[in-house]
Amino acid sequence: MKIDIFDTTLRDGFQQEGISPSVKDKLEIAKLLDNLGVSFIEGGWPGASPKEEEFFKKAKSELNLANAKLVSFGSTRKLSLSADKDPQVQALLDADTEYVCIVGKSSKLHITKAIQATVCLLYTSPSPRDLVISRMPSSA
């Protein structure tokens, strides 16, 4: 049995007030996580800040990961924009990572009340690409 570790230190781990690692720090931490054998390293949210964009640019040329795959993190498109017009979706594409983690509203309450959209379930057959979809329930 193989267990894949999906590490969120470079994004979620730095959300505490007063913690703001440099791009160099994030690159070094990514190397350490790779050396530990972590399977996936969530690098951050490209488009959230120029520093995040710089991290992904430098990671492309400076990180030679032996074990891990770098993952960019972002959200679904804004309800009022098509995906090709949404700057967040474009930032995910510009990060040029092999893997992307996309967070989106999945509870009926969030969909109908928070973003005031309708619930639509779409079932698809497996795609020819390796697409993994997992759902983690929110606390609300």
Predicted segments — roles?
Residues E28-I41:
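Catalytic domains of carbohydrate-active enzymes, especially glycoside hydrolases
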Residues A59-L65, V89-T97:
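Acidic (Asp/Glu)-rich catalytic clusters
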Residues L10-K24, G74-S82, K113-V119:
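Active-site mouth loops of central-metabolism enzymes
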Residues Y123-P128:
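Conserved small/polar residues in nucleotide/adenosyl-binding loops
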Residues I5-T8, I41-G43, A68-G74, V100-I102:
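Hydrophobic faces of well-ordered beta-strands that scaffold small-molecule active sites
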